[in-house]
Amino acid sequence: MKYIKVVFVLLIVAVVYACATNPFTGKKTMAFVGNDQLFPSAFAQYNQVKSESKVITGTSDAEMITRVGQRIAAAAERWLVANGNHGYLDDYQWEYTLIESDQVNAWCMPGGKIAFYTGILPIAANETGVAAIMGHEVVHALANHGQQRMSAAYLQQGLAVAGNVALASDDQALGIFNQSFGVVSNVAGMLPFSRSHETEADKVGLILMAIAGYNPDEAAELWKRMKANSGSSSTPEFLSTHPSNDSRIATLQELAPKAKEEAKKFGVTSFRPIN
């Protein structure tokens, strides 16, 4: 019993002290892995992906990805500085890569390494659509969502170990715990946790694209195209790490006017044409 208490105390101490501050909410978040470890690992993975992929350079699409990325990064810098987060991006090493692939995918690694796959460009449809995707993915990195997911996974593993230690003398209870813990912790904890990241990335991503001069109204149109591309098959929202397409579209439509108001604070009163 004494050992069990020690395990739980160590978990509590880890959660309390291993924290970082989300620059968009000001709230403390779990950070068992620091940027000094996370960024080099992300950069190495990025270089590996590039070495194993067909990277497109010198085309109008590749130039667009870089152009939009630079504008979103500049918007993020302006927004962060205006909200008191000076120097937050000092360790970022922005890079923008277009990869030839049918995958409908794009991502931004911790530290600012961004990849777009050609398969997502028809759904983006235009430069403003690319900006909507870019803003969303950049926020995942800036808000430390990857770091939080890794930390939550470590905590989940720690709780599983603690549960096994606590129930080691009761085979029946231990069996029930191991059968149910993964499902319960995912549905009640990890999945809503991931959905909250998606919602935050949508909200702040709209602001960044608006500050960069792109019309945030296009984000909802992008997700209508994404919904059409995904067809009728969809996972129930409570079992998904992402909000449903309909929920996301409604949220984006509601938040777009607020993003425009935020952009006005940075002198943005009109947006680039959508074409």
What are these regions (language model features)?
Residues K2-F8, Y17-N275:
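A Zn2+-metalloprotease active-site environment signal
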